[in-house]
């Protein structure tokens, strides 16, 4: 469906455990070392990650593989991210989204709630600077939430449509300065409400769009009019560079 819309996607690998039974499994944002994962764990986790890539790699809408998220089960970062880079050199690799960057992969990715503040690194090589999560303004519309009897939250609670429009508009405006400094992407939390979280732009039942689409379009269009920092080609395509590509069927036969 994303392919039919022309929607570009980032595909995350899931975290390596259901819950953090041991605190060292969740790497602290300021930690200088990764989790020393058992060999059996990292072997199984990598097996499932490469199976995911093999299963989904034929969908051109996927532009980026995301390996680790916010320190959850983060282990052997440099080794694993470099493996993914070699395994699929046709896509961008976001080695660590949020928190514990190890200087590997195509992106430097920071999470910040609810504001857009971000210190862009001065010496980042050719890595892309990304605000991988921000915002999270929560407006609970009671008739349209998953379970009204539980806590429904956002990173900052908002009361009503006008307050949300004003707050969201300020966030988008604040991105303009970062783009001029070299910010390449920003991911708002989030598209829809989910179980227990009401920070979506659309309600859980998909019946209410909290900010009118036309207004969102006007807000976002300003971001594309800003002159960014100098662009750098990281992966050549058929029109730019010398990347050779082949079209093959699912059984590996060239078309």
Predicted regions and their residues:
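Active-site mouth of glycoside hydrolases
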Residues: 1-106, 124-125, 149
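A polyampholytic, Gly/Pro-enriched intrinsically disordered region
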Residues: 112-120
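Active-site regions of enzymes building and remodeling cell-envelope glycoconjugates
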Residues: 104-112, 128-129
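Substrate-binding clefts and catalytic carboxylate motifs of secreted carbohydrate-active enzymes
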Residues: 46, 61-65, 121-230
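Residues at the C-termini of beta-strands that transition into short coil/loop
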Residues: 13, 97, 111, 133, ...
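C-terminal outer-membrane/trafficking sorting elements
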Residues: 230-255
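Flexible loop/turn segments at secondary-structure boundaries
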Residues: 17-19, 71-75, 101-103, 116-117, ...
């Amino acid at each position: 469906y994303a392919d039919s819309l022309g929607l570009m996607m980032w595909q995350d690998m899931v975290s390596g455990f259901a819950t953090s039974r041991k605190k060292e499994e969740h790497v602290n944002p300021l930690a200088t070392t990764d989790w020393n994962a058992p060999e059996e764990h990292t072997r199984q986790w990598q097996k499932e990650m490469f199976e995911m890539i093999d299963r989904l790699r034929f969908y051109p809408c996927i532009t980026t593989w995301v390996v680790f998220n916010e320190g959850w089960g983060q282990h052997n970062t440099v080794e694993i991210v470099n493996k993914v880079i070699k395994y699929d050199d046709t896509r961008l690799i976001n080695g660590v989204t949020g928190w514990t960057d190890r200087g590997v992969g195509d992106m430097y990715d920071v999470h910040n709630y609810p504001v857009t503040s971000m210190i862009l690194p001065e010496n980042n090589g050719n890595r892309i600077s990304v605000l991988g999560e921000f915002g999270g303004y929560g407006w609970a519309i009671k008739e349209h939430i998953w379970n009204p009897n539980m806590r429904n939250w956002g990173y900052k609670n908002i009361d009503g449509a006008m307050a949300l429009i004003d707050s969201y508009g300020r966030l988008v405006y604040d991105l303009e300065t970062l783009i001029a400094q070299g910010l390449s992407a920003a991911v708002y939390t989030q598209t829809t409400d989910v179980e227990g979280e009401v920070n979506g732009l659309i309600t859980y039942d998909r019946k209410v769009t909290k900010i009118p689409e036309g207004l969102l379009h006007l807000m976002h269009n300003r971001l594309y009019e800003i002159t960014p920092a100098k662009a750098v080609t990281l992966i050549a395509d058929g029109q730019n560079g010398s990347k050779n590509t082949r079209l093959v069927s699912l059984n590996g036969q060239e078309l």
